[in-house]
Amino acid sequence: MSIQAIVLATFDAKEGYNVENYYPGDFNVEGIEYLLFPSGIQELDNCTIFFRFQDQLCLSVFSKLQHPSFERSAFFTSVGLILSDDINFGEAVVKYGETLLYIANGLSLATLKYKFGEDASETYASEKCTSHQLSDSDFFKSLQTSAVNLEFDSLFEKLQGNKFAILGANSKELSQSYATILLDHLGPAFYCLYKFALQRKRILLISSHDDQLYSIIDMIVRLSSIKRSSDASIPILLSDLHPFYSVGLANTSTLLDNDLEEGWIACTTDTVLLSKSSLYDLALYWPDNSFNANKYPQIFNSNSIRIKPSYDDLINFKGLSRYLSFDGESSWGLTTYSLASKYIFNTSHHNLTDQEFLNENMLDYFQRYNQKLLTVLSSNAESFNVSDMQTLGLNPCHSLDKSFVSEISQIWLKKHINWQYGKYFWLRRVSLIFLASTCFLFILWKLL
């Protein structure tokens, strides 16, 4: 059984949140009406919401309906399917999305007719007919008929009897979709997010509502997963990062009280959660609706202190974008950052991307890197040196990268790292910084 329950909830300025109907009748839906509606509903016309209710996933469609007869001329409906199968957002949309749209359309129409009369429902129906192409499928027609008649038991039976598509885990199209999201919305912040996910930390994404936030969660969970290896020296002790998807102030206690060893990732529109530093280890924040403007997020640690991507993160992102983008972007930026990092920070061109990436699925590529990371750590934990860091595309002098390696070794392999950098390694770094600064001042003096 794929679907546990179907729920219809409404909101208006006079009556507040209400669960209008649900099926089966013995299913406990207490409190779900607050989760079915996103924060800032007055600013949204419609959207898809994905969240956990009683540790089960729920996919819902929210709609804002406007008519002079409504309280403050606005009435809100949300129809949710509580799922029993443990799938991610992308799979849920493909599997149930179109079906849920038809059900939500019919139930909203029937609710308007019941509460506000024929005129309001006809206005809503005409708007939907012009904005959506209705399917001629007998299945969808029967769904809408049951929805319009508020036959929840019939809807539930039809949903249970339908054979939904079985989806592949790693498709090329999915990889391309993730690549677009990474380039447009994450930028160099991606590598910081990816590293914290590998460390199984608590991660919070804060932005105005956008379905692609759920896709970012799906992507990070998959990219940070580690497949079980045949190598007995690499035990897999942790599960994938736990996705909570959409959360709000009502979920604060759940997030604080959980003891998930595998960490979690969630998104919210409640910016006040950014001030609750004990709630998360890493927060990505898109201020002032900038998520839709293709701007990169600000990054905050658990002390609510803003951090910025390292030079190596910039190098790796430039390399990644070089392979993922199709606009023929110049590699000058990559060269500039590589030279700066090589001669000032003692790294080399061992980036997290290489020529092999061109012929690989992005999801497979990062899972292969994760396996390589554990293999190198398992072999060299007792004597980890500069060359080992460079092999992994990490900065041997950057404190966040060193902390990353130490934590990965501890939580995945239960080993402590024994750093072997050489007695005078720090002198090399200082001398190179001095040399680079001198060259910069000399060039500046010549230019002036």
Swiss-Prot record:
InterPro entries: LCHN/Anr2 (IPR018626), Lipid_Metab_Assoc_Protein (IPR053056), Tripartite_DENN (IPR037516). One of its GO terms (cellular component) is Golgi membrane. Residues 4-155 form the uDENN domain. Residues 183-326 form the cDENN domain. The chain crosses the membrane at residues 425-447. It comes from the Eukaryota. Residues 328-428 form the dDENN domain. Keywords: Endoplasmic reticulum, Golgi apparatus, Membrane, Transmembrane, Transmembrane helix. It is found in: Golgi apparatus membrane; Endoplasmic reticulum membrane. It holds the Pfam family DENND11. It is a single-pass membrane protein. PROSITE patterns: DENN. This is Uncharacterized protein C119.16c.
